[in-house]
Amino acid sequence: MNKLIRLLSVVLAVAMLLGCTAVAEAAPRAINAYKAPADISIDGELTEWNTTSAATINVEEQVVRDPGQWKEKGAEDLSLDVYVMWDEENLYLGAKILDDTPFMYREGFPPDMADSLVLFLSTDPSADAARTAYTANDWRVTMVIDDYYYNTGIDRDMIEDNKGFDTVGEDGDEQVLDGYEACIVEIDGGYTLELVIPWTCLSGAEIPVFAPAAGMTVSVDFGMFDLDFPCPGVATVRMQWAGTDTVDTDPSKWGSMTFCE
């Protein structure tokens, strides 16, 4: 009898362990955005950042375009950790990016065909995380990383009712974010990056300026395009935190971000 009880205990323990593993694997992607220090300096260094919570993009399953190009070198070709900070006026993005051919851009290349970071963000904490269509408070922001112009764009073509805020910067040759700042520092195999996006850039006449507060949770995702040679027709790898390019039209595929002190 005692042997049977011990056997059942082992079986139950294994079942519980497997159950916990399954839950962990199915858990949605989530990160924290920490309150920025009052004296933050945008210099490309990440020394002021809390890097305990990152959106990590570094595996083959996250390559959603031209995977053959990425497989040749793997994470050395492109991989990144993205961090987020905030205050009442700005959203801050920091990143450590490995890229063996960084800062590739050519005039006339759209952001999706150049080296560019992409932010997917909801500015409506009350939005249903399971929604499958963009609303006016859902944003796809492109930021070209070329070590010179740092052009930006906002894609709104997928929104049925955009509340008067149309797509801008789709050609990759404009700076559409008023007050935007960007700075990089080269490191072995890549670079570190700091960006500032004023909350006012993600608002309009019918879209109020977002007012973040500790404890709020919103939908978010991150992606990166990687051009290895600035020539028409060359493959441009795309990696996505979500592991799918359907994030372009379906925010239910995004992860989540909680604002913290």
Predicted regions: what is each one?
Residues 26-261:
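Structural preference for beta-rich elements and adjacent junctions enriched in aromatics
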Residues 10-19:
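Bacterial N-terminal signal peptides
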Residues 1-11:
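Bacterial N-terminal signal peptides that target proteins for export
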Residues 18-28:
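Sec-dependent signal peptide cleavage junction
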